[in-house]
Regions:
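Substrate-binding pocket helix/loop in short-chain dehydrogenase/reductase
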Residues: 106-107, 111-118
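Conserved glycine-rich cofactor-binding loop
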Residues: 23-24
Length: 296
């Protein structure tokens, strides 16, 4: 299997960061964090650029752009606008693919349109932006390379009831990113990091979540999805979760520490514990059912 992220990554002076989904939550926090760093430049994007008013308008190192990741034309236009703005110094050094939302509820109730739109945003949106960035990065003559953070989730590794299409999108990001990372020539110096945070203290549950119509067959309080909803609700009321600024700090640390980039980056103790538990159970099952699978 081809190795990935072979060489230490060195964040250049004057690096340009392109971040999607900057209107709120994690994306907003990362954009604000990068904007405070000297010798770093920022392309902050959102479907509605008026939501980026928290960033200054008169800083030549900060570019605010409209970007709908579900539109190929919108993605292409954003990259063209960035190239025009930064001119001869244009290069995409760091990408943070953060745009997305969660479709939650009883999977049996999901319409085709709801399911397709979720996957279109989470997965294909990430893929569109990533490949546009790869094109810019690999064409750099001095092999400056770059770093692409694809924001997955604990939900990209561990599945829970009531979020089937959200999991489908995040699991797809994980497998797709691993495959694309192995397609890169080592000389291109293009690095990938799949970010897997557990719960974050943002307005995600309210502003970045869409709910399917409830299904009467799953309405009872003892149904798994209802139990999970109650548990999550208690956690939100207690203030549980990762501070979004901690995610911004973690990503900047990965980019700037002059070391190899991890392909997977679980964030938070909950993510670490649950991912570790799943992998241990998977290894246990692998041995338990080895004879059942011994067919070749």
């Amino acid at each position: 299997m081809n190795p990935v992220n072979n060489q230490p990554y060195h964040l250049p002076v004057g690096a340009i960061w392109l971040i999607t989904g900057c209107s709120s939550g994690i994306g907003r926090e990362i954009a604000q964090f990068v904007a405070t760093k000297p010798n770093q430049r920022l392309i902050a994007t959102a479907r509605d650029p008026s939501s980026l008013s928290y960033l200054p308008d008169n800083d030549p190192n900060i570019l605010k752009l409209p970007l709908d990741v579900t539109s190929t034309a919108s993605v292409s236009n954003a990259f063209k606008a960035a190239a025009a703005h930064f001119g001869e110094t244009y290069h995409i050094d760091v990408v943070v693919n953060n745009a997305g939302y969660s479709l939650s509820g009883d999977t049996e109730s999901a319409t085709d349109e709801e399911a397709h739109q979720e996957i279109e945003t989470l997965f294909f949106g990430t893929a569109r932006v990533t490949m546009q960035a790869v094109k810019v990065m690999r064409q750099e003559k001095d092999h400056r390379g770059g770093l692409i953070f694809n924001i997955s989730s604990l939900a990209g590794v561990c599945a829970f009831p009531g979020h089937a299409y959200y999991h489908a999108g995040k699991f797809a990001i994980e497998g797709w990113t691993e495959s694309v990372a192995r397609e890169m020539h080592p000389d291109w110096n293009i690095n990938f990091c799949i970010v897997e945070p557990s719960g974050v203290k943002t307005q995600f549950e309210h502003g970045s979540k869409k709910y399917m119509e409830p299904h009467e067959a799953y309405a009872a309080d003892d149904m798994p999805a209802r139990k999970l909803e109650a548990w999550v609700g208690k956690g939100l009321k207690s203030g549980a979760g990762i501070e979004p600024v901690a995610i911004a700090e973690a990503l900047f640390n990965v980019a700037s520490r002059d070391e190899k980039v991890p392909l997977h980056l679980p964030l938070g103790s909950t993510a670490y514990k649950l991912i570790k538990s799943k992998l241990e159970k998977r290894l246990e099952d692998l041995e338990t059912f080895k004879e059942l699978g011994a067919i070749g």
